[in-house]
Amino acid sequence: MAGAAPRVRYLAGFCCPLGGLAAGKPRVLCHEAEVFLSTGSELVYVYDQEGGLLTAAFRFPDQVWHLELLAPRRLLYALCARRGLYCLSLDHPGRSRSTSQDDRDSEDGDQPSPVIPVDPDACILPDAALCAFTLLDSVLVTLVQGPARWKMQLFEQPCPGEDPRPGGQIGEVELSSYTPPAGVPGKPAAPHFLPVLCSVSPSGSRVPHDLLGGSGGFTLEDALFGLLFGADATLLQSPVVLCGLPDGQLCCVILKALVTSRSAPGDPNALVKILHHLEEPVIFIGALKTEPQAAEAAENFLPDEDVHCDCLVAFGHHGRMLAIKASWDESGKLVPELREYCLPGPVLCAACGGGGRVYHSTPSDLCVVDLSRGSTPLGPEQPEEGPGGLPPMLCPASLNICSVVSLSASPRTHEGGTKLLALSAKGRLMTCSLDLDSEMPGPARMTTESAGQKIKELLSGIGNISERVSFLKKAVDQRNKALTSLNEAMNVSCALLSSGTGPRPISCTTSTTWSRLQTQDVLMATCVLENSSSFSLDQGWTLCIQVLTSSCALDLDSACSAITYTIPVDQLGPGARREVTLPLGPGENGGLDLPVTVSCTLFYSLREVVGGALAPSDSEDPFLDECPSDVLPEQEGVCLPLSRHTVDMLQCLRFPGLAPPHTRAPSPLGPTRDPVATFLETCREPGSQPAGPASLRAEYLPPSVASIKVSAELLRAALKDGHSGVPLCCATLQWLLAENAAVDVVRARALSSIQGVAPDGANVHLIVREVAMTDLCPAGPIQAVEIQVESSSLADICRAHHAVVGRMQTMVTEQATQGSSAPDLRVQYLRQIHANHETLLREVQTLRDRLCTEDEASSCATAQRLLQVYRQLRHPSLILL
């Protein structure tokens, strides 16, 4: 469409709910320069096209379902959901009154406008079941949702200048039955599709055309009127009410016959005539001129003049269109011609314009079809001035405007085009100036120059459509891929969460080993992710490995934080495995805080998968880019814990003495030393002893010892699998070092004691021996196994003792589930041991408090006594049974 002026002009924007406006409820009416608009909410707006301002907004007590304007009386009728019918006088002085700032709705337009609350007295017909209405000169027609049937009611309209409340009811008839929607008991549920009412008058009727809008009312030519509604309606010159129901029925009621039926009752079913059944919800009923000569004459009519239409149309929600027209049959007889067309759907709204054109909107486009083109030529036996037929098929022409939920067609403009007033799903009010004569295909000849220009336009349009289709296809592919990924993620989550205590379909195992990097030994952790399920881990999956040291776990107020490693999982199919190696220490201070907890978790990123599919980054389509942020998931993703492994001192011990002499590796390096200390040591005289704290402690102080005793019977029951024929002490040491790299050598040599090196270089001695506990059981001594840890480093002995106690706790918990019973014990002896331990613990607290207040000279004796008490606590006289 050529022209300097823009075809679409946006007038104003109105607030709308998330997801856009729903079709069926919004309404746009235009009278002269004023636009009356309802978005389906509680507000009805009045917009001045000449001034470009929102002049007023009326607030109703509930959603507004339908609007009609009685132009000569300046009355606006509004159907309020579950309330009834309201009538507002547009000339009322209340429209110009000043309102407070609280009554202004700044979101509903470019400038604040007064919001006028509708007075409850404006409700002229209260009825919670009222679903549709239409107006005639002296009659108000309503459609009520009954318990099981629709009910049409007629009321007298007051004369101009009187109270707008309708008079008494003058007629009533029941229409077809329906299945009521589910709702709250005692409160009728709103139908998903509202019925459509409109009035039809014959051309000879004196009823003025004072209703605006496509479904308000129209006049039909006598030929079509008589064929559709019969001789009674034609003789009575009676208006007829057309009703389109949500079940697809298109029926009619002759008003004068309905009024007179009260005085002469008869069969009520005879008052209702079913014209057609679309088999889908009826959303629009209208009429238009299709004959070429009549259509041209109709376009030159003044807005207030009646146009005698020769074609009746009705639209269904899913795209089915019905057109009815008076036509000649083969015998030369005038008969009604009914044609059904299948157009793209779903249809959101429709309107009839000039030139025999019908406009209808879908979520993706606004289309126009021409019912005046393709009319069958007149035969020799038909009258020369007779009507032509309907086209056998319709080809919708795209106007490249999408998501229009309400439409109003204005008369032909001064420039010769057609003007549409439209409301989009995003709440934008716009005008569309169309010159459809250059857009619609026709039989008129064109020059070579115009044909070439037309071909260029068509090729350009094909290119744009092809490009848009490619973007849409890519967006659909991305969303399908995201849905497939989400389905796989759901399957993986269900498989992991439902595995319980059995083998997990996706597992992650952790092992440790020492490696030498440059001049320093580093403890490395190897995490193996294995997929034993039938699902694949593709886009969006990440393996998260968190390393938490003991200092961070115990000191909640410390500044240290856990280290988390994230490894993207790419194409890990069924049966595949992925190996990740990462350092555990020593840290920057040269030490290794044990125990270290390694937690493995699978993380699925919802924002990476879903966010990329909802808003493609390379799309040039504005409708794809405008992805509301609230559609994206609130959570970042889904976490699925896989494993939790604790690395303790027993796993980190190294045993250089176990290697054969000819293959013995050099002694493990300790933590990185201070360069100054290294320099002083090199300057030391040959033959002198080192003077470091560790050397002095090892030379002059006896090693610290900690022990724990376990029942031999308990150990045999726990170690019976895999250790048969092995001495109990050797089996116990092998069990303690099961996760150490040297366990195979310990097993091969059948050792019961071993000396290793801690990560800081201090020696740690493990001794396992059998002992007899004689004082616990009155029946005799209890055979036990004593596990003793010796080291000159207090920190290392505490870590090793903690590791041994942790293994014992796990073993006792597992054996307790098997229901083993303990022997009879001397309770008094146990109480005495417990009392002695309580005394030692109180003494420890006293000595620690004293160290905080004493000077340096007297604190040495206190510290020495504190060490003695700790040694006694590490040698309990109790036994694990």
Curated annotation (Swiss-Prot):
InterPro entries noted in UniProt: Faap100 (IPR029251)
Presence of keyword DNA damage: yes
Keyword hit for rRNA processing: no
GO CC annotation, single: chromatin
One Gene Ontology molecular-function label: DNA binding
Main location group: nucleus
Designated name of the protein: Fanconi anemia core complex-associated protein 100
Function: Plays a role in Fanconi anemia-associated DNA damage response network. Regulates FANCD2 monoubiquitination and the stability of the FA core complex. Induces chromosomal instability as well as hypersensitivity to DNA cross-linking agents, when repressed.
Keywords: DNA damage, DNA repair, DNA-binding, Nucleus, Phosphoprotein
Any one Gene Ontology BP term: interstrand cross-link repair
Species whose genome carries this gene: Homo sapiens
Modification Phosphoserine, positions: S667
Record's subunit section: Belongs to the multisubunit FA complex composed of FANCA, FANCB, FANCC, FANCE, FANCF, FANCG, FANCL/PHF9, FANCM, FAAP24 and FAAP100. Forms a subcomplex with FANCB and FANCL.
Region of interest: Disordered: 94-119
